[in-house]
């Protein structure tokens, strides 16, 4: 793909979205002052970030659970490197929740004190690939891919926002002992959502009543989120970032195994070979179909 410099800003080997980030912010990320009770949602793009923002917003904010406060999830758990709404992060009340796509080596040094918590959400990369393909076709701030085949090559070359998927997840996993981090699988959460919410609450040391857990589970389903203007990003993508067509949405399907409808057998097998070569020493569990055990 041509003109990638129009969309990507590369800093220390990592691709940021060029129009949403300022170089002075990027250069000072590692020196940003972290609070002991900060929480970071870390993901590779298209891996369940918005879902996790909604889950943590529901866990932490009673006004979000009982719908008495009309605050968007992007303002409750803003993107650390992409301050789209120009919030003053230093004045945010504790505990602060941040979302981020950055790799382990660019995060604030204070996260290595192991007091602030990191929730790393990961998703099977074939579904990430297909979700990213559709998202790039929708959003004006991303290069518009021609075909799944051409985008698959771009994705596997790491010439996308977020850089190479393998480097991102492997880097975080191999350096997990440097941080207070928990890895969560998008697919596991889909299979047993309530248990996953309880696991997240335990990691965050956040006690909720059974009734509150029920409220989190009920409101963080994909269908409920899609209908919730606080969480569906519709206003943000259409009015603030811009789309190529009116039909698309930020929250598209959120299903497991959608890749089967888009990748040919040959593409899938080529992807598998690259996956196994890169991930053979990473014991994280991956689910490629929702019917898998």
UniProtKB/Swiss-Prot annotation:
The keyword Cytoplasm applies. One of its GO terms (biological process) is sulfation. GO terms for cellular component: cytoplasm. 3'-phosphoadenylyl sulfate binds at residues 46-51, 123, 131, 220-225, 252-254. Pfam families: Sulfotransfer_1. One of its GO terms (molecular function) is sulfotransferase activity. This is Amine sulfotransferase.
């Amino acid at each position: 793909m041509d003109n990638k410099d129009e969309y990507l800003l590369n800093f220390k080997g990592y691709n940021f979205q060029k129009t949403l980030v300022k170089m002075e912010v990027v250069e000072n990320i590692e020196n940003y002052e972290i609070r002991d009770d900060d929480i970071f949602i870390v993901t590779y793009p298209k891996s369940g970030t918005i879902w996790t923002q909604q889950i943590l917003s529901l866990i932490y904010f009673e006004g979000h659970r009982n719908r008495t406060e009309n605050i968007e999830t992007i303002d409750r758990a803003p993107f650390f490197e992409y301050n789209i709404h120009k919030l003053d992060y230093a004045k945010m009340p504790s505990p602060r929740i941040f979302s981020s796509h950055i790799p382990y080596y660019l995060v604030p040094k204070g996260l290595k004190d192991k007091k602030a918590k990191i929730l790393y959400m990961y998703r099977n990369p074939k579904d990430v690939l297909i979700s990213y393909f559709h998202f790039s076709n929708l959003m004006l701030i991303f290069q518009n891919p021609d075909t799944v085949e051409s985008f698959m090559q771009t994705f596997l070359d790491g010439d996308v926002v977020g850089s190479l998927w393998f480097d991102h997840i492997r880097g975080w996993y191999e350096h997990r002992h440097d941080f207070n981090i928990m890895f969560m699988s998008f697919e596991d959460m889909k299979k047993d959502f309530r248990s996953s919410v309880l696991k997240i609450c335990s990691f965050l040391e956040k006690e909720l009543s059974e009734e509150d857990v029920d409220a989190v589970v009920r409101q963080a389903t994909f269908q409920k989120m899609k209908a919730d203007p606080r969480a569906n990003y519709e206003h943000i993508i259409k009015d603030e970032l811009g789309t190529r067509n009116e039909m698309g949405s930020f929250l598209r399907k959120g299903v497991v195994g959608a890749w089967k409808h888009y990748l040919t057998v040959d593409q899938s097998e080529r992807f598998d070979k690259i996956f196994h070569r890169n991930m053979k020493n990473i014991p994280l569990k991956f689910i490629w179909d929702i019917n898998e055990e």
